[in-house]
Amino acid sequence: MRLIQNMSTIAEYPSADCPSSRVIKIAVIGGSGVGKTALVVRFLTKRFIGDYERNVGNLYSREVQIDGEQVAIQVQDTPGVQVNANGLSCTDHVSRSIQWADAVVMVYSVTDRKSFDLIGQLHQLVTRTHSDRSIPIILVANKADLLHVRRVDAQEGPVLSSALSCSFYEVSASEDYNQVHSAFHRLCVDLAKLQPQTPINATSSVTEKKRSPLIPRPKSPNMQDLKRRFKQVLSAKVRTVTSV
């Protein structure tokens, strides 16, 4: 895994560092403290780290194999979203992340009822942002291992995801890597099927087109060549007349 940046500006994957023919961009959104960063790090590194610094919106990258194809995955972590008297409160970074992404992971914690209640508004934000096209969205319920402090019933997640027409996964970032990997990997597979595949020789074709003017072409005869050829022809005629 590679941390591309931790600034609020979202940059494209540097082309020089990305030999893959496909780049998948995923934004992870949700309320504060639901475990977004833990999910991202768990998926990309298999590790779980319990303590994190305040989420500043890091952009992570990793190359993986999907159906035999090398794919570059960019995962944009985002600051937590809250609800205030005026509705959904999120930073410009969250909005830009959604607009930038090819797919979105919405996360809530089963221990936080408020994080579950704002999912509907988050889904509306995503669909409004991508009103011109439909992008893959999945709903992830995190912290499934904390049964003793559960505040969202197990049946509520699937019901909500069905209403929003998106896939649902209940996971524990701290205890089960396979659950987390399954959710993200399935999303990447579905997204890869939707994206047109770039031909392997596409880059080389462009390069060849750019280099084509460098191919040597026959030179037009200059004045020195013309004079030299004229003298050769003239000398040949003189020799012919002399021999006669």
From Swiss-Prot:
InterPro entries: P-loop_NTPase (IPR027417), Ras-related_GTPase (IPR051065), Small_GTP-bd (IPR005225), Small_GTPase (IPR001806). The keyword GTP-binding applies. Gene3D superfamilies: P-loop containing nucleotide triphosphate hydrolases. Residues 200-222 are annotated as: Disordered. The keyword Transport does not apply. It catalyses: GTP + H2O = GDP + phosphate + H(+). It holds the Pfam family Ras. Keywords: GTP-binding, Hydrolase, Nucleotide-binding. GO terms for biological process: mesendoderm development. PROSITE patterns: RAS. Residues 19-242 are annotated as: Small GTPase-like. Coiled coil: none annotated. Its EC number is 3.6.5.2. It is an enzyme of class 3 (hydrolase). CDD domains: RERG_RasL11_like. GTP binds at residues 30-37, 77-81, 142-145. GO terms for molecular function: G protein activity; GTP binding. Belongs to the small GTPase superfamily. Ras family. This is Ras-like protein family member 11B.
